[in-house]
Amino acid sequence: GSSRMFYPQGEVVAAREAGKAGTGYTLSTLSGCRLEDVKQATDCPAWYQLYLLGGRDVALKTIERAKSAGFSAIVLTIDTPVSGLRELDVRNGTKELLSQNPLTMLPFLPQMLAKPCWLSQWFGDGGLMNFPNVVLENGPMGYTEIGPALEQSVVTWDDLKWIREAWGGKLIIKGVHIGDDARKAVDLGVDAVVVSNHGARQLDSVAPTIRVLPEIVKAVNGEIDVLMDGGIRRGSDVVKALSLIHI
């Protein structure tokens, strides 16, 4: 999510390049670009990563938009119950910069002016992005609203039923971290699970995904696909993950 924070039309560009590379792309609800624009930019398989931000009614409208746009799967995210306390962001002044308060942003002005090319691109792309795929009563959700919105959007097993009914297609759960949850996902008709700890960016003491991968694979017993993210930096990491599931 939020690729647009780092590059103009970031999600559109990423999806387009994924298509050129012949691989798939998963678009986060927390994208700075409209899901329709992102899907239109690529011919690659595209999945929509769903957060329940804004509540059930907002999510249902987003699901309908994703269906109409041609996304082929919903990836329901369960590994982000709160916004993580990221120490680097505390030190680098992210909160102050996102506040859009001129007084708190003033100390960072020299750094901004030292990057005129970036600054012009940032303003040219509309400045601080919002979330056009989370449309609330007063318009798209603002960037500073993420924390409170996440705290009110915790996913439960009961949510799977209405999400599946509304979507009608492939449903994947991202953030499964123990075998019991993986087994329950299978029993409830989920098509795949993603073993993920959100890069340990939400809870830094959680177990690495490669350590819990064998437990998840054993629990699903080959009945659904198992994907894994986090910690893969080179080809040897892929070999290790594949080896662990065959022990």
Regions from the language model: what does each represent?
Residues 10-13, 208-212:
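Charged helix-capping and loop-helix junction motifs
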Residues 193, 241:
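Hydrophobic, well-ordered secondary-structure elements that form the walls
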Residues 203, 235-238:
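Short glycine/serine/threonine-rich phosphate/pyrophosphate-binding segments
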Residues 213, 218-221, 225-233, 240:
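Extended C-terminal subregions enriched in glycine
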Residues 245-247:
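Conserved small/polar residues in nucleotide/adenosyl-binding loops
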